[in-house]
Curated annotation (Swiss-Prot):
GO cellular component entries: cytoplasm; Holliday junction resolvase complex
Organism: Burkholderia orbicola (strain MC0-3)
Disulfide bonds: none
Transmembrane segment boundaries: none
Entry binding sites for Mg(2+) 2: 66
Gene that encodes the chain: ruvC
Cofactor: Mg(2+)
Catalytic residues as annotated in Swiss-Prot or TrEMBL: 7, 66, 138
The protein, known as: Crossover junction endodeoxyribonuclease RuvC
Subcellular location: Cytoplasm
Name of one Pfam family that matches: RuvC
């Protein structure tokens, strides 16, 4: 099964594609969609077109996207919601089922700790997918979203699904930290 993860943002939208076979996770591609400094409609169109292109080029079976959180600044929350909507439209236009997870669910499923830092997310994604280099934070969050979906969005402690992948690499999670 191929899963596309999306980390929505008005300026930068991260994407990550992984293949899942049993408990094995394989990296396919990741990156970001950068919007131009332009009016809102143009930026949303760029996100929609970018996501549509990724769906067309990589043919994922399912997609997962981060839910919007209510920020201190309501204007920022509204803009993020619109960017997220443009990405969802690109996914749905490509015929994909879309799952949604909160940032807390994402961090718990990937790192094992709901208050994990960006660096911890990047480190864990790099290790789980056996990447030679560390992806940027937006791409890492998107890859993490795909990993979260691959394992049903459950926490690392209840899932057993990541345990074999971690054990193969000589790793385990203890108190929300990756230890070897």
């Amino acid at each position: 099964m191929r899963i596309l993860g999306i980390d929505p943002g008005l300026r930068v939208t991260g994407f990550g594609v992984i293949d899942v076979s049993g408990h094995r996770l394989a990296y396919v591609t990741s990156g970001v969609i950068r919007t131009p400094t332009a009016d809102l409609a143009t930026r949303l169109g760029t996100i929609f077109q970018g996501v549509s292109t990724i769906v067309r080029d990589h043919a994922p079976d399912q997609a997962a996207i981060e839910k919007v959180f209510v920020n201190v600044n309501p204007q920022s929350t509204l803009l993020l919601g619109q960017a997220r909507g443009a990405a969802i439209c690109g996914l749905v236009a490509g015929g994909l089922p879309v799952a949604e997870y909160t940032a807390l669910q994402l961090k718990q499923a990937v790192v094992g700790y709901g208050r994990a830092t960006k660096t911890q997310m990047q480190d864990m994604v790099t290790r789980l997918l056996n990447l030679s280099g560390q992806p940027g934070s937006d791409a890492a969050d998107a890859l993490g979203m795909a990993i979260c979906h691959a394992h049903g969005g459950n926490t690392l402690s209840t899932l057993g699904g990541l345990a074999p992948a971690l054990a193969q690499k000589g790793l385990r999670v203890r108190r929300g930290r990756l230890v070897g």
